């Protein structure tokens, strides 16, 4: 946050995981089901290891509540969430948060173009973050 802004206004720090208990959603991709909060925390953990600043990490409401899905049999809702994940989360990681660290962030796929990352996500799911991403990050969160 800009130092001039901090001097002029009061603000309260809210941790990146505050209120995550209010957000419940699942996402099915590449034949596996994942919890939204756990997957975003795993992504945050990987980003932190890559020394991405905390203000670039994903909060629980990075994806709007309207896309959250609790019914793993609701294919339409899941398709919408997968689409939002690709078009919002992956684009944010590719274009902004991990722009200088694409090789390490997307180590499980061809990261030369955003479209290649999206195609790989459709095929491999969260393995785009590395073959061991689910075991190294997701299962430890």
What is each stretch, according to the model?
Residues 1-141:
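C-terminal regulatory/interaction module of P-loop NTP-utilizing enzymes
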């Amino acid at each position: 946050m800009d130092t001039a802004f901090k001097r002029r206004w009061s603000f309260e720090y809210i941790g990146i995981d505050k209120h995550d208990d209010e957000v419940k959603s699942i996402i099915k991709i590449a034949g596996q089901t994942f919890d939204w909060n756990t997957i975003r925390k795993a992504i945050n953990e990987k980003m932190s290891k890559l020394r991405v600043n905390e203000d670039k990490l994903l909060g629980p409401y990075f994806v709007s509540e309207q896309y959250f899905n609790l019914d793993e049999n609701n294919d339409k809702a899941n398709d919408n969430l997968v689409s939002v994940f690709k078009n919002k989360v992956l684009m944010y990681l590719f274009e902004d948060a991990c722009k200088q660290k694409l090789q390490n962030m997307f180590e499980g796929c061809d990261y030369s173009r955003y479209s290649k990352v999206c195609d790989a996500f459709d095929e491999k799911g969260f393995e785009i973050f590395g073959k061991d991403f689910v075991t190294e990050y997701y299962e430890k969160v």
